Amino acid sequence: MNNIAVFAGSFSPFTKGHEDIIRKALPLFDKIIIAIGQNYNKKDVFSVEQRMNWIQTLYQPNPKIEVLAYEGLTVDMCKKVGAGYLIRGLRNAADFQMEHEMYLINKQLAPDIDTVLIPASPQLAAVSSSLVRELWQLKADYTPFVSYKLPDIE
């Protein structure tokens, strides 16, 4: 496996908290693949194309970052792209518990792929895509939490 990492999520939308994790991870890896996964437990408000466009615009022309969309297991996609690492952000103890459980399952499914946990910066630890979506849907100011404009709601 190369020094390639995958940062996977639904990113609906991609927040400044996600940007913080990428900023911290960039010096650690030769390449980071931001992978937009289809989460069947979530109803996506924004299309995959919108999310890809927002993220690509944020990171152009950084040669160390690639953006892709995928379906299926994250570890299977990691194997397909030759990534040896999964990046996961941690905001709180609940995130740690969930990520630890996912780590245990992923290790059984793909023993060669390691998980790197990166804590959120304190000022961004409360930021989540769910929070941003709620603010956006209520037509409240979401701009402190994302680096781009979301589409207007009719």
Residue positions per predicted region:
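Nucleotidyltransferase catalytic core that binds NTPs
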Residues: M1-E154
